[in-house]
Each structure stands twice: as C-alpha cells, then as structure tokens.
Amino acid sequence: MSFRSHMPVLFRHCDPAGIIFYPRYFEMLNDVVESFFAEVANYPFSEIHPENGVPTADLQAQFQAPSWHGEMLEIIFSLSRLGGSSATTRFVVSCQGKPRMTAQSVLVHVGSNRKSTPWPSHVRFALESLLEES
C-alpha cells in the first residue's frame, strides 16, 4: 500500500525560469511524511518533537524531468523496509502520470536523548501499511 498526496507547484517553489528549485522537492516530501504521521499514524510532528523526533538519516534523489509552476504533482509515499526504529522510504513524484522525481530516504525514530528508539506500536502498525510487497 502507499500514501498518496497531491500538491500544486506554487510560485514559492520555483526559480526564475518557472521550474521547481530542486531543494523545494525535499520540503514537499517532508510535508507528505508529516501528513502521513498526522493523518494515518495519529502521531503528529507537533506532538512528536517536544520529546522525540523522526529525522532523516539518509536521502537520495533522482530527477527525471522538470516540474513547472501551476502543475499538480502526485507524490506516492511507501516503505521498502521497516526496522525497529527506522524506515526506508520511497517517493515517486509525477505529473499526469509522467515521472518527475524519485527519492529514497531513511527515517529514524529518536527519543529525548536523540538516540534511536523503537517505533510506538500504533505508529509501527501504520508504517506497516506502507510496506511494498516484495
């Protein structure tokens, strides 16, 4: 299964040529992760961050084509691996079925000591729903 989100390419996302300035993609991906944690895992970042966190430990991206101001992007979020305190993510960004960007990251659940700590059971259950079938 996957978590799908739609995001418009806004003026603030673009460089003077009218295409997404690539670091903005990473903000969009984080927005999708944050939405998933709030809407599906019932673990909103506003409640996580006073004591815990879900930092990105690794991030890789591949860009297939530019995205333009005014377009609507679909972002598909899934997991290729779920560990005790980490998750390996996969993102596919497209516009009208045409690939624009793919990315993989590793998210780590950390405690107040900023060391990895196991996912809470209800969060792990929600994350399991994102695991890709092998």
Predicted regions and their residues:
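Hot-dog-fold acyl-thioester-processing enzymes
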Residues: 1-56, 111-134
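Hydrophobic beta-strand-centered segment that forms part of the acyl-chain substrate-binding groove
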Residues: 36-81, 87, 101-102, 108
